[in-house]
Amino acid sequence: MQVGSRTLIMNPVSGTGDHAELVRQLARGKGFAVWETEGAGDGRALGRRAGEEGVSEIAVCGGDGTINEVLRGLNAADHLDEVTLNVIPGGTANLLAGALGIRDIRHGFDLTDKGEIRSLDVGMADGEPFMVSCIAGFPADASTAASGELKERLGTLAFVVTGIQEAVEFEGLELRLDLHGGGGSDSWEGSAVTVLVGNARRFIEEGGQADMEDGLFDVAVVEDVPAGNLAVEAAIHRLLGEGTDSVHHFRAAQVTVTSDDPVTFSRDGEIAEHDRATMYTRPQALDVRVGPEYEPRPD
């Protein structure tokens, strides 16, 4: 195999920041050319370069944010549906890797030769792709304020936990949701502290992996947070657990969120503000190598 037909993009300082040399060695053994990021935005630039050069198999070593940057670059080069993605978990929470059944760096490299290739849904928001989730609402600094330790334990939910901690002084936003697909159309209007849109992640009941091949988002609208001194993680389970009156659950292929005021959106950790945003799925748009524990139809 010609080196260059397989390319790995690595964030050498993601996670604990001690994986770079191991990744270089394993990548060479698997025939991957290695491109490394040096700062913010490099993942997107390198992803676009890979797309423009016609790379057919790409590996990304970093966290969910690095993967998101690379996918945005591939999308900008109109190459998202022309490439096979290999995920090498090198971040803190590694939510996408977990959903794909990829345990660690060595396991990720093992799968570059023998992992099953599945065609997975890609979420789109504001014209940009995301794989794990898009979260709307909460104060703008909730995502960046989430601690590394919290992200390690809860991943994307760290944003929700931090938001709940700050929601004591946050009155919520007047929102309208218009939802389509999944057997019909629906709408919701009212005051909410957050809207959780999951592609690889479910936010209700027991959480965990969502169905990434059904063309639908799992959507949860959280109206308010529990009062009192309830522990934050218990609050998460109370909020998102089955039968909670303050949470509304939908499944939809397209979700439009509209507000009179700017709303903060966190798309796999990438922050933007809009008073109107539409999220939709591109069904089975990205070929991804998965581990043997990946569940195409999770319960």
Predicted regions and their residues:
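ATP/NTP phosphate-donor binding region
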Residues: 1-58, 288, 295-299
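Glycine-rich beta-strand-to-loop/alpha-helix junction loops that act as flexible
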Residues: 12, 61-63, 88-91
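Catalytic core of DAGKc-family lipid kinases
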Residues: 21, 79-84, 90-192
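Short glycine/serine/threonine-rich phosphate/pyrophosphate-binding segments
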Residues: 43, 65-70, 95-96
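Short Gly/Thr/Asp-enriched flexible loops that form oxyanion-binding sites at enzyme active sites
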Residues: 66-80
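Short hydrophobic-aromatic micro-motifs
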Residues: 128-141, 189-198, 203-204, 218-221, ...
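Internal helical hairpin/lid segments
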Residues: 191-243
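ATP/nucleoside-binding phosphotransfer catalytic cores, i.e., glycine-rich phosphate-binding loops
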Residues: 223-299
